[in-house]
């Protein structure tokens, strides 16, 4: 959530930054200013009416002691009460609308973020590794997986419908190996491993910015008013909701493996085949809760931590800085890491690493006590995939495929998997 004081004091700046995302967002700022003005007018009027009521109440007591008639003043007090009740209800509605409007406004892009409309305006930062030159036509991962008997799309559809897959045999072992490898790597770097709930309350999703804007993309358990998590970022970041942290305990590094559940409401026709875009997929998440002064240094380190997974797996990739029009709702700055897919002859996103600054912290009310000023300040929150497991598995199948249909297991995974090569069963 954007600081309403910033909107009050620098409305033109806020509008300018939001317009780099989408010009239509400017109208939300005007609505906030209008509601905020009305709110303050009501509060001022209420204070005046309450003051008058208090004075008259004292006057009634005085007149009664003197044995004088108080009918006229009592009638006025009754009128004041009715007016105060009406204004208090109006204030409640205005404040609710103001809060809801603020919840729909995305984060302000950091000034360093390149201005652009969509992914075509993203800026490549660096590449690592050389894409393998095949002496045969590389097959797509879904074809490789089906031939190996490790990806079963028909049975996945039989069980749950489209965009669900059964991963079996050596594929299941490879999936588990990737999860353990990623968690082992991150915990050695100081990330604390967490096993969070997969069902969360609505306010938890409001905290990280999925609600209210992205409700259509979430799975909801109506009877219990709980949502399946779309990413472990949601429970991990909210662990410190409504808390005041000690400055000396920052930074906090967290990691978790969870399945993620997404309706993919806006993905019709995209990545229909394979396991690139699923309703349920595994992911290892990285979350940082840090001091505001260090958050951009922490972002660069976060990207490096995600990159190291791909480097150790020997998978070629590139790092891309997202432009303003392609930024996620809660992010002030984001780097995407894209891994090479030979069958598509292009890089595909496998990790997104973002600094949300204090945007999520304001929604969660997560603060720390500043040792210099003694005042409470909002923390900065960061998150990144470390990595999306299914996409990593797909990238391994494609980059390590052999002409005979087998797949070589990356060296760092062999002890986890228990074999050097996966062959057709």
Swiss-Prot record:
Top-rank EC class of the record's enzyme: ligase
GO cellular component, one term: cytoplasm
Pathway: Aminoacyl-tRNA biosynthesis; selenocysteinyl-tRNA(Sec) biosynthesis; L-seryl-tRNA(Sec) from L-serine and tRNA(Sec): step 1/1
GO BP terms: selenocysteine biosynthetic process; seryl-tRNA aminoacylation
Locations listed in the record: Cytoplasm
NCBIfam families, per the entry: serS
EC identifiers of the protein: 6.1.1.11
UniProt-listed SUPFAM superfamilies: Class II aaRS and biotin synthetases, tRNA-binding arm
Keyword annotations from UniProtKB, A to Z: Aminoacyl-tRNA synthetase, ATP-binding, Cytoplasm, Ligase, Nucleotide-binding, Protein biosynthesis
Domain comment in the entry: Consists of two distinct domains, a catalytic core and a N-terminal extension that is involved in tRNA binding.
Record family assignment: Belongs to the class-II aminoacyl-tRNA synthetase family. Type-1 seryl-tRNA synthetase subfamily.
Catalytic activity from the UniProt record: tRNA(Ser) + L-serine + ATP = L-seryl-tRNA(Ser) + AMP + diphosphate + H(+); tRNA(Sec) + L-serine + ATP = L-seryl-tRNA(Sec) + AMP + diphosphate + H(+)
Keyword Glycosyltransferase part of the UniProt annotation: no
A Pfam short name: Seryl_tRNA_N
Residues that coordinate or bind ATP: 262-264, 349-352
Residue positions binding L-serine: 231-233, 285, 385
Subunit structure and binding partners: Homodimer. The tRNA molecule binds across the dimer.
UniProt-recorded name of the protein: Serine--tRNA ligase
InterPro entries cross-referenced by the UniProt entry: aa-tRNA-synt_IIb (IPR002314), aa-tRNA-synth_II (IPR006195), aa-tRNA-synth_II/BPL/LPL (IPR045864), Ser-tRNA-ligase_type_1 (IPR002317), Ser-tRNA-synth_1_N (IPR015866), SerRS_1_N_sf (IPR042103), SerRS_core (IPR033729), tRNA-bd_arm (IPR010978)
Record's function text: Catalyzes the attachment of serine to tRNA(Ser). Is also able to aminoacylate tRNA(Sec) with serine, to form the misacylated tRNA L-seryl-tRNA(Sec), which will be further converted into selenocysteinyl-tRNA(Sec).
Gene Ontology MF annotations: ATP binding; serine-tRNA ligase activity
Transmembrane segments: none
């Amino acid at each position: 959530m954007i600081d309403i004081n910033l909107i009050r004091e620098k409305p033109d700046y806020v509008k300018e930054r939001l317009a780099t995302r989408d010009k239509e967002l400017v109208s939300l700022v005007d609505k906030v200013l209008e509601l905020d003005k009305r709110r303050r007018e009501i509060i001022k009027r209420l204070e005046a009416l309450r003051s008058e009521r208090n004075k008259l109440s004292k006057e009634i007591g005085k007149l009664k002691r003197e044995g004088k008639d108080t009918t006229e003043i009592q009638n006025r007090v009754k009128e004041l009460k009715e007016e105060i009740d009406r204004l208090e209800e109006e204030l409640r509605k205005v404040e609710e609308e103001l809060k809801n409007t603020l919840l729909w406004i995305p984060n302000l892009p950091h000034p360093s973020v390149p201005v652009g409309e969509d992914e075509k305006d993203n800026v490549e930062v660096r590449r690592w590794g050389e894409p393998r030159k095949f002496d045969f036509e590389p097959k797509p991962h879904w074809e490789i997986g089906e031939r190996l008997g490790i990806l079963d799309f028909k049975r996945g559809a039989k069980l749950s419908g489209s965009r669900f897959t059964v991963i079996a045999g050596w594929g299941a072992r490879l999936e588990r190996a990737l999860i353990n490898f990623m968690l082992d790597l991150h915990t050695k770097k100081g990330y604390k491993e967490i096993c969070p709930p997969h069902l969360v309350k609505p306010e938890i999703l409001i905290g990280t910015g999925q609600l209210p804007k992205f409700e259509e993309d979430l799975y909801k358990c109506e009877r219990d008013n709980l949502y399946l998590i779309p990413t472990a970022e949601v429970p991990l970041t909210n662990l410190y909701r409504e808390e005041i942290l000690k400055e000396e305990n920052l930074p906090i590094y967290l990691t978790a493996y969870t399945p993620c559940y997404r309706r993919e409401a806006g993905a019709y026709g995209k990545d229909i085949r394979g396991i690139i875009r699923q309703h349920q997929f595994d992911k290892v998440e990285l979350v940082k809760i840090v001091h505001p002064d260090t958050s951009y240094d922490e972002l660069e380190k976060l990207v490096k931590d995600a990159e190291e997974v791909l480097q150790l797996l020997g998978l070629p990739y590139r790092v891309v800085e997202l432009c303003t029009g392609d930024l996620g709702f809660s992010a002030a700055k984001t780097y995407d890491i894209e891994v090479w897919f030979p069958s598509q002859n292009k890089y595909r996103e496998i990790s997104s690493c973002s600094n949300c600054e204090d945007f999520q912290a304001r929604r969660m009310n997560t603060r720390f006590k500043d040792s210099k000023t003694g005042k409470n300040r909002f923390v900065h929150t960061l998150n990144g995939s470390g990595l999306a497991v299914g996409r990593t598995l797909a990238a391994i199948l494609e980059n390590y495929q052999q002409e005979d249909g087998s797949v070589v297991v990356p060296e760092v995974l062999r002890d986890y998997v228990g074999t050097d090569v996966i062959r057709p069963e």
